[in-house]
């Protein structure tokens, strides 16, 4: 969303609205501060005058971890200075079918390259553990979309990824292994299904695999109304998730 419903506001308006959200959340009964996130996936593109970079498909072609970390660090600074806390990036998708309309979101079809560049991106956004982790100018990062979004049958978006668990992890899970090692704070669930079951309602993958086996200790966040993709669910109600 844009400050006060208008796209042409400058950074001071973003900061003003962020402060208003924060104060409103702190004045509630529980006093839990709000976390405001944005899809700054190749620059803080909702902010007028922000620097924009190529999408991941272009950045992946460089195979340059230092460059990716530097770019993410620049984006983090602009998100931070606008008063926001979180970016829904990086995507660590592994596109395996060029028919998929979101192949541009992935660094590569090579899981090892996705893992290395995803790790570099997270460290650019959040900083490095023991050095500058979430210090001034850094923001929370999100590894997405867990898991198998780039491996659906015939490249259908929000489709069905039919793989064994070993192949799912070996091909589509390596970006999460590497970003969890860098203490990524958020992981976003995917719209797709795995062997016929939607990810947003899949406890085994989101809890048993991601948290208990992979060791993710952060926040699992849904994609845009992703819970309504689960059978029997709606945007306003989904007990299955």
Task: Give each language-model segment a name.
Residues 1-241:
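Glycoside hydrolase catalytic-domain context in secreted enzymes
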């Amino acid at each position: 969303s844009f400050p006060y419903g208008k796209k042409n506001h400058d950074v001071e308006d973003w900061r003003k609205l962020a402060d208003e959200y924060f104060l409103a959340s702190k004045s509630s009964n529980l006093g839990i501060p709000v976390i405001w996130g944005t899809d700054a996936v190749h620059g803080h593109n909702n902010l007028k005058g922000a620097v924009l970079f190529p999408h991941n498909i272009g950045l992946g072609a460089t195979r340059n971890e230092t460059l990716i970390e530097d770019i993410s660090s620049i984006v983090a600074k602009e998100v931070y200075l606008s008063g926001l806390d979180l970016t829904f990036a990086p995507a660590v998708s592994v596109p395996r079918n060029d028919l998929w309309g979101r192949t541009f979101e992935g660094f590569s079809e090579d899981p090892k390259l996705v893992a290395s560049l995803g790790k570099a991106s997270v460290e650019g956004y959040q900083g490095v553990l023991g050095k500058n982790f979430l210090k001034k100018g850094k923001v929370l990062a999100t590894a997405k979309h867990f898991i198998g979004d780039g491996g659906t049958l015939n490249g259908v978006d929000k489709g069905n990824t039919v793989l064994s668990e070993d192949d799912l992890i070996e091909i589509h899970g390596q970006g999460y292994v590497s970003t969890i090692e860098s203490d990524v704070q958020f992981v976003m669930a995917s719209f797709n299904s795995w062997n016929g079951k939607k990810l947003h309602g899949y406890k085994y993958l989101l809890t048993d695999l991601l948290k208990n086996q992979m060791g993710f200790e952060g926040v699992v966040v849904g994609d845009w109304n992703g819970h309504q993709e689960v059978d029997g669910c709606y945007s306003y109600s989904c007990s299955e998730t």
